[in-house]
Curated annotation (Swiss-Prot):
Pfam family, one: CinA
Protein known as: CinA-like protein
Secretion signal span: none
Organism: Citrifermentans bemidjiense (strain ATCC BAA-1014 / DSM 16622 / JCM 12645 / Bem) (Geobacter bemidjiensis)
Family stated for the protein in its record: Belongs to the CinA family.
InterPro entries cross-referenced by the UniProt entry: CinA (IPR050101), CinA-like_C (IPR036653), CinA_C (IPR008136), CinA_KH (IPR041424), Competence-induced_CinA (IPR008135), MoaB/Mog-like_dom_sf (IPR036425), MoaB/Mog_dom (IPR001453)
Length: 414
């Protein structure tokens, strides 16, 4: 089954808004056994929308369309759909009833501008929208069933799950499967070298590299009938890349770390400087993190490091705030203040200013202290302020993950 996606909106083409809808649709279709063959983005222009619908309708079995169903003058999708389908707009009493009931719950009265959302292509089939004013609809254009949904992500996602996917799933001929391996701490070229010969020539398994800074994802795909080949290839890649593999499929670094912390029974405290609370935000993003995360300190200034973590002022004066000595003192102070089993600290120069020849922008120190030891390491990251902060945060999480894995597999610990 050939499926296309059409995204509508000036804001998508100007770069003001990232088109997360198209990505979500493609992802959910793939999980359901289908695959998007084409994706077009067009502006809020009736002629451009109608032309794209005609083109996609001639080459696809189904077209999933998002955007342009609102109440404002630039919402032209219904008009363009009617034109491409060779019909006209008519006032849908069912859509108008939905609008009035929705307005009564929210504001008590339907705004006159919203009435235009009930003008839909004649003979279309409606798609319920329990979360918003804009009902979706289905019309036949060319040889394709075209499914129209609003561009508001949480509305579109609900409609996709409850109406569109159930209708399309039974029409996929050969379902697709995939395995996503998530890596950190290795470059693409090094991955390619490690994987040489891992997937034999002629294998039905497809391999794609996807960089999602600071992670690299390896995506293996195959049809359902070739699932044994897919699992065999995934197993080979896991073995070759085990030193860098932190999660698979929908699991994130946060989830993996949460699992390890729960299994360890250890508690954690943080002391952050250049990351400004980013590490704590990632850890607490997982529900139930209060079972192991006690507290986080954002000690940005030298005075705060001394006042909150008892880092001696003379130590900062002698070695600088960005130093192994201060990172160690921050971790020790955080552990003592919280009464935790572990404490992780970070101090660094994110830029764009503050660097020196000895400690250029991107210099970061991480420290991890437990009951019997303290490990400190210096890193030299590249990039602008956002990239330095992002990779510092991720490195800290990965550092903690590796510590917990080592502790788990070391006899006499855990």
């Amino acid at each position: 089954m050939r499926v296309a996606v059409l995204s509508i909106g000036d804001e998508l083409l100007s770069g003001e808004v990232v088109d997360t809808n198209a990505s979500h649709i493609a992802d959910r279709l793939f999980q359901a056994g289908g695959r998007v063959e084409r994706h077009l983005t067009v502006p809020d222009d009736a002629e451009a929308i109608a032309s794209a619908l005609t083109e996609l309708g001639a080459r696809s079995d189904a077209v999933i369309v998002t955007g342009g169903l609102g109440p404002t003058p630039d919402d032209l999708t219904a008009e363009a759909a009617a034109r491409a389908a060779g019909t006209e707009l008519e006032l849908s009493s069912e859509a108008l009833d939905h609008l009035e009931r929705f307005a009564q719950r929210i504001t008590g009265e339907l705004h006159p501008a919203n009435r235009r959302q009930a003008l839909l292509p004649k003979g279309c089939r409606l798609i319920p929208n329990p979360l918003g004013t804009a009902l979706g609809f289905v019309v036949r254009i060319g040889q394709a069933d075209c499914f129209f949904m609003p561009g508001v992500p949480y509305e579109m996602e609900r409609m996709l799950e409850e109406t569109v996917l159930p209708e399309l799933t039974g029409r996929f001929e050969a379902g697709w499967q995939r395995v996503t391996l998530k890596l950190f701490g290795i470059a693409e070229a090094a991955i390619a070298e490690l994987l040489e010969g891992a997937i034999p020539e002629g294998s039905p398994v497809q391999l794609a590299y996807c960089v999602k800074f600071p992670e690299i994802h390896l995506i293996l795909r195959a049809t359902a009938s070739d699932a044994p080949f897919l699992q065999q290839a995934a197993g080979e890649l896991r073995q070759r890349l085990s030193a860098y593999l932190f999660a698979e499929d929908r699991e994130e670094m946060d989830d993996r770390l949460a699992l390890l912390l729960r299994e360890s029974g250890l508690t954690l405290a943080l002391a952050e400087s250049c990351t400004g609370g980013m590490i704590a935000a990632r850890i607490t993003a997982v529900a139930g993190s209060s079972a192991y995360f006690l507290e986080g300190n954002v000690t940005y200034s030298n005075e705060a490091k001394t006042r909150m973590l008892q880092v001696p002022a003379p130590l900062i004066a002698e070695h600088g705030a960005v130093s192994a000595e201060v990172a160690r003192a921050m971790a020790v102070g955080a552990r003592e203040a919280a009464g935790s089993d572990l404490a992780l600290s970070v101090t660094g120069i994110a830029g764009p200013d503050g660097g020196t020849p000895e400690k250029p922008v991107g210099t970061v120190y991480l420290a991890l202290v437990d009951q019997g030891s303290c490990r400190v390491e210096r890193f030299n990251f590249q990039g602008d302020r956002d990239r330095v902060r992002s990779i510092t945060c991720f490195t800290a999480l990965d550092w903690l993950r590796r510590y917990l894995l080592t502790r788990k597999t070391t006899p006499g610990r855990g």
